[in-house]
Every structure is written in structure tokens, then in C-alpha cells.
Amino acid sequence: MKRYYTNTIQQNGRIYTRGYDSGKQYFNKIKYKPSLWLKGDGDYTDISGKISLTKKSFRSIKEARDYIKQYTGVFDIYGDLQNQYKYIAESWVNEIEFDSSDIRVLNFDIETMSPPEGGFPYPDKANAEINAITIEYNNSYFTFGTGDYTPKADNSKYIKCDNEIDLLTKFVNLWSFISPDVITGWNIKFFDVPYIINRISKIISPEFANKLSPWGKVISKNVKTLFGKEQQTYDILGVSNLDYVIIYKKFTFVTRESYTLNNIAFEELNEKKLDYSAYENLFNLYEKNYELFIDYNIKDVELVKRLDDKLNLLNLLYTTSYKAKCNYEDVIGTLKVWDVICYNH
């Protein structure tokens, strides 16, 4: 029977890990006792195989951290890798077997009104109302809005909400019920995720935004883009953010003229986003043709689903992470994966 993690982090001096055991979801907080290695006549060697090492065990993460702080620069310390990866290496010594059908993937997209001052709705300000959200989970679609709408497909459900607070509350409740291991969508890392967390924090409360995490915590961070610009995003602890545009760039090894969802869907699926050119902008579409506006929101989510049905990039990413014995998001980078591979070999 398969037992494997989907996300493992260090938090509050413990290892927080979630995953599946024989298809059943588990969540554990582990009081981890790490080890380090020192030069000595022991049974271990460094990666070159030339330096003999002896193992030194500690009673807690804090004790090991204090030891490193005290003796760094005094003598060589080996095996100083982040503790979540050491825990994974010790818990899964052999090859990790997983079942991708277990892994809960929540694919979503939000729409917003125009800000009161006009212009683009920036995620860090989140000063425009969220007026529609669609979630795709396990090939079922759930759309939240405040107007009247009739679903066009049997696997689509529309949830009419009283107002924006009701919409966001119901969205978070469904998210929590699904308990996703992975979230995806198009440009969600730098738009949808920071926007929705900042908006929930602003009009409901930061505590309610924390409900998006199975560990009850979302953490704001600024990330430098390729052009050196800093953008806000969030770590939703326990949930892997696998933005599909990012993994598309990482794993397809082709250069596209544009990485908009419209262009990539056309290149890969010979299909485009829903056309609303008869209306000046999305706000006018929302005001004048609500049915088409919701169709547009659903279509964006459908396109991401169909892209992965064709390309299977999420499964490729899972496979790579389990080969390396790291977290899913680590595979999007490079250095962390190699650090973990070196540690395990």
C-alpha cells in the first residue's frame, strides 16, 4: 500500500507533513530529532567518499540549530540541510511510490470589478470587489457569483451569493472542504492568490484568510521576477502553489511569442478564451451580459484543465519531486532539488 507526502515543511520547531496512506489523507506534526555529521572514524562519508564522518544526534530542531550556530567556522559540519528534507530522506529511504489520483488539485480563477479610482486591480491593494470565482476539482466546476446564471454543463454548479463577503465565505468553505494538496491556474501566484488573500483580509479578516491553510497560516513574501521587480505573493502553508504558466515555461522547452492563457491555449489546443470584444471591457461585460461574463470565467478554468489533460505537466512535476525527495514547488527551481539529491546520495 502506498504512503507518501504531498507537502512537508518545518514550522514552530516541528515538522508539519501531509500526504496519503493507502489513499487516506493524513496530517501530522512531528517532534523531529535531527542529526548532523562531523569528521571522525565513523560509518559515513561525505559526497566525495573520501572523508570519514560520524553521526551526531540531537533531541530537537532547536538543539541542532544552536549547535550549528555555536560551532560554524570552528570545525566542519556536514548534513546541514533544511530539516524537512532530512525528515523525508529518513522516512522514505527507498523509492517513493505515489498515486496521482489521490492528490487533490484545486484549479481556480477569479474576476474583479474595476477599482474605484479606475485602472488595473492590483493584488497588493485588492481595492476592487471580487465578483466571480470558479473552482475546478476532480472535473467538477463550482462558480460563485452574485447574479443570476444557468449552468451550461452537467458537471457545472453555480452558487448564487448575497454579496462579496458571502461569496468569499462560501469560496473559503468549499476550499477547506476540498482540502487541496495543490492549487493551480494561470498566473495565480502573482495575481489570484495574493489578490484573494488580501481582499479577504481587508473585508473579512486576516484570520479568515488563514483558513486557506490546513495549518492555519498564510505568509506574505516578496519575490523578485525575471526583470528584477518585486511582487507580493503568499505561501499557504501545507498547500503547493503550482501556477500553470510557471510550470509550462519550466517543462515545455519551447519559446512562445506570448505566455497569455489565450495564446498558449491556441498553440496547444487550437482554442482561445471566450471572446467578449463586443463589449468594451470585462466590467461592461459584467454589467450588460452577466451570463457571458460567468461563461468567460468558467472557460479560463476549463482551458487550464484541458492543457494539463494534454500535457500532463503536474504529474511530471510530482514524479520529479518524488525522485529527488523534495516538495513539489522545489522542482520549479533548481538549486534546492540538487541540494536534496546530493544529500540523499
Model-derived segments and spans:
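Conserved RNase H-like, two-metal-ion catalytic cores of nucleic-acid enzymes
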Residues: 3-10, 14-46, 88, 92-182
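Extended acidic/polar, glycine-enriched regions
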Residues: 48-103, 157
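Extended, Lys/Arg-enriched charged tracts that mediate electrostatic binding to polyanionic substrates
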Residues: 97-117, 212-234, 343-345
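Short catalytic/ligand-binding loop motif for oxyanion handling, primarily in non-cytosolic enzymes
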Residues: 115-116, 190-195
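Short secondary-structure boundary/capping segments
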Residues: 122-124, 194-207, 335-337
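Active-site-proximal helix-loop-helix substrate-binding element of RNase H-like nuclease domains
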Residues: 143-144, 151-158, 162, 179, ...
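Common nucleic-acid-contacting/processivity interface regions adjacent to the catalytic cores
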Residues: 279-345
